[in-house]
């Protein structure tokens, strides 16, 4: 998947748990959980939906590395190319 496809997958996964969120509302350099008002359970459901659509797992140890949309997209691109 290219970066645009990954971004669309991320937005769709966010909308699974927060359907009111529009992709253009997300500041790519701000904390994703705060931008989308995701509590810890919402965040886990979001990551599960993302794994289902991309086949890329983000282990708990890496949660701190993917706290913004840009960081998450970078992470997914690296993981997808391995």
Which role fits each region the language model picked out?
Residues 2-38, 42-45, 52-53, 57-82:
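Phosphopantetheine-dependent thiolation modules in NRPS/PKS and related acyl-activating systems
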